[in-house]
């Protein structure tokens, strides 16, 4: 690579690194909302990693090839962090699902709107499928990177003496395209379904800034590969040196850094009216950002899906789903309504495998019932609450606490997903 091109890339990368590092340090020094800012800083670090690896590839291709797998993996990780940020803005997964309870389902995005019914994210199983659609790219990307490295080491990645359909490059690229398309489609579906709830948190510039860098990296590489295959980039001179994926990424990084600075500005998290809000020390905040225990636990829960059941995502209010299929699904999982829908309770279910065995052996209509009542636990028990003696001394304190906004004005509750704090807590 020409020295002039290397110097130009270094200048643009230096600007991007300065902007990103200032933004990251500012967040770490004002780490007042760890649940939100953890994901924000992780997203901002994508600029640092992209800029550094792209410049190393321009400066020395062999050195850059060593760090390129980390850049590819972090791209998928940043997409996961953005999804977590949207969830945390809404107060967590349960709050996000409950916020859509009773709302009409949304039409699916093209082209699945012609093939499937409208999507109802108030159903925890539908939410789980969307989340898995987003995270599968994060899970799959490390294996794709390993596959590329192994095929390059063994010399079968893009051999010229083999047909195109037998090329490892073709099949790895096909799996990659399907995976990232599914992930971006699922993320867009989630954003469209909850755009009204996310509106106070300025989701569009955040969504655009994260998606832009991924799209730029992907489509530029695709276009350059096609033009190179057609023999259009076989010339010499500085113009052909500029038409390089890593060179283009270096030149674009300052603009991506500015977009991330605006989208994830510190003013959304550093609220001056929060006089009693503490923050973590700088090193502790950085340690919290680079820790991956939360990612590991969330990935295991999403992969297993055991906690994504109707009982865990049913609102406390007596709201009935807007569509019949939503009520049928909850009823089939043990939810029962009483008093004309004014109250509800859950009953246990038989093991469905046993139900099928009973049906086959007895062939009785009564065996089709897949639910039973728990002995000693009648409907009135669920409706009337727990049976215990009321303490005459404690009850007035509970009644006074219920009249306060947060239970106790000496210890105000600060919601991490509220970007505009009130100046008064009482």
From Swiss-Prot:
| Segments of this protein annotated with the region ATG8-interacting region | 386-409
Q: Which InterPro entries match?
A: Ostalpha/TMEM184C (IPR005178)
Q: What is the effect of changing residue 398 to A?
A: Results in a 1000-fold decrease in the affinity with atg8
Query: What processes does the entry annotate via GO biological process terms?
Result: transmembrane transport; vacuole organization
- Which terms in the Gene Ontology molecular function aspect does this entry carry? transmembrane transporter activity
Mainly resides where?
membrane
Q: Where in the cell is it found?
A: Vacuole membrane
Q: Which residues carry this modification: Phosphoserine?
A: 364
Query: What, per the annotation, is the impact of changing residue 391 to A?
Result: Moderately reduces the interaction with ATG8
Give, from the UniProt record, the effect of changing residue 409 to A.
Results in a 6-fold decrease in the affinity with atg8
State whether keyword Transmembrane helix applies. yes
How does the record say this protein sits in the membrane? Answer: Multi-pass membrane protein
Please state what is observed when this gene is inactivated. Answer: Abolishes the vacuolar membrane localization of atg8.
Per the record, the domain of life is Eukaryota
Purpose of the protein: Vacuole membrane protein that recruits ATG8 to facilitate the degradation of vacuolar integral membrane proteins during early-stationary vacuole turnover (EVT) when cells enter stationary phase.
Quote the subunit structure annotation.
Answer: Interacts with atg8.
Q: Which family does it belong to?
A: Belongs to the TMEM184 family.
Protein known as: Vacuole membrane protein hfl11
Species in which this protein is naturally found: Schizosaccharomyces pombe (strain 972 / ATCC 24843)
């Amino acid at each position: 690579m020409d020295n002039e091109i290397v110097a130009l890339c270094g200048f643009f990368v230096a600007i991007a690194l300065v902007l990103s590092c200032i933004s990251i340090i500012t967040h770490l020094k004002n780490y007042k909302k760890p649940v939100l800012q953890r994901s924000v800083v992780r997203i901002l670090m994508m600029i640092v990693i992209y800029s550094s690896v792209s410049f190393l590839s321009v400066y020395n291709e062999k050195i850059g090839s060593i760090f390129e797998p980390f850049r590819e993996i972090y791209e998928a990780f940043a997409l996961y962090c953005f999804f977590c940020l949207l969830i945390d803005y809404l107060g967590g997964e349960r709050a996000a699902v409950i916020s859509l309870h009773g709302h009409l389902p949304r039409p699916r995005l093209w082209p699945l709107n012609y093939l499937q019914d409208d999507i109802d994210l108030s159903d925890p199983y539908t939410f789980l499928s969307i989340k898995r659609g987003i995270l599968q790219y994060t899970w799959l990307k490390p294996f794709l990177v390993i596959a590329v490295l192994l095929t390059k080491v063994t010399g079968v990645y893009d051999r010229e003496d083999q047909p195109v359909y037998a090329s490892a490059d073709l099949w790895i690229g096909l799996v990659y395209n399907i995976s990232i398309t599914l992930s971006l489609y699922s993320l867009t579906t989630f954003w469209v379904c909850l755009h009204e709830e996310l509106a106070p948190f300025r989701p569009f510039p955040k969504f655009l800034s994260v998606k832009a860098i991924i799209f730029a990296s992907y489509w530029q590489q695709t276009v350059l590969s096609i033009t190179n295959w057609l023999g259009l980039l076989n010339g010499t001179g500085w113009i052909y040196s500029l038409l390089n994926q890593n060179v283009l990424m270096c030149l674009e990084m300052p603009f991506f850094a500015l977009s991330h600075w605006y989208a994830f500005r510190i003013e959304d998290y550093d609220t001056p009216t929060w006089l009693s809000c503490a923050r973590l020390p700088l090193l502790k905040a950085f340690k919290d950002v680079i820790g991956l225990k939360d990612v590991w636990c969330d990935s295991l829960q999403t992969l297993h899906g055991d906690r994504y059941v109707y009982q865990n995502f049913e609102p406390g209010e007596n709201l009935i789903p807007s569509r019949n299929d939503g009520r049928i699904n909850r009823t089939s999982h043990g939810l029962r309504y009483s008093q004309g829908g004014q109250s509800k309770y859950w009953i246990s279910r038989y093991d469905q495998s046993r139900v099928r065995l009973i049906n086959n052996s007895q062939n009785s209509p009564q065996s089709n019932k897949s639910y039973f009542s728990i002995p000693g636990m009648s409907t009135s028990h669920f409706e009337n609450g727990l049976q215990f003696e009321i303490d005459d001394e404690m009850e007035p304190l509970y009644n006074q606490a219920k009249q306060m906004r947060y239970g106790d004005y000496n210890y105000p509750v600060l919601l991490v997903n509220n970007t505009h704090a009130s100046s008064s807590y009482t």
